[in-house]
């Protein structure tokens, strides 16, 4: 599907998304372009849902995707506990204007 490539090869795109999800979990807020934020959001929502499950298989799946073991620990111990009663919608996208240089629409992606 050409509309989800983000202008990158598949290996670069996957690495970028993994980096951004890891950063989102560690920092709880990142600034990026709108298109990238929408892609990261869907992955981050799935990671939080896996963490809420909390079993060993879920822990292994999350650890395999995230680059940082500290981020995985935070996801299971802090973030999953925060959203235990919430049935989805763990992230928020807030528009912040346009990037100087190429006028790309910029947003803040944050955990609610």
From Swiss-Prot:
**What's a single GO MF annotation on this record?**
structural constituent of ribosome
- Keyword match Ribosomal protein: yes
Tell me which PROSITE patterns the record gives: RIBOSOMAL_L17 (PS01167)
Q: Extract one GO BP annotation from the record.
A: translation
Question: What keywords are annotated for this sequence in UniProt?
Answer: Ribonucleoprotein, Ribosomal protein
The reply to whether Ribonucleoprotein figures as a keyword in the UniProt entry is yes
GO cellular component labels: cytosolic large ribosomal subunit
Cited Pfam families: Ribosomal_L17
Q: List, alphabetically, the InterPro entries matched.
A: Ribosomal_bL17, Ribosomal_bL17_CS, Ribosomal_bL17_sf
Top-level lineage group: Bacteria
Protein family: Belongs to the bacterial ribosomal protein bL17 family.
Q: Subunit details for this protein?
A: Part of the 50S ribosomal subunit. Contacts protein L32.
Q: What is this protein called?
A: Large ribosomal subunit protein bL17
| Native organism | Desulforudis audaxviator (strain MP104C)
What gene is this protein translated from? rplQ
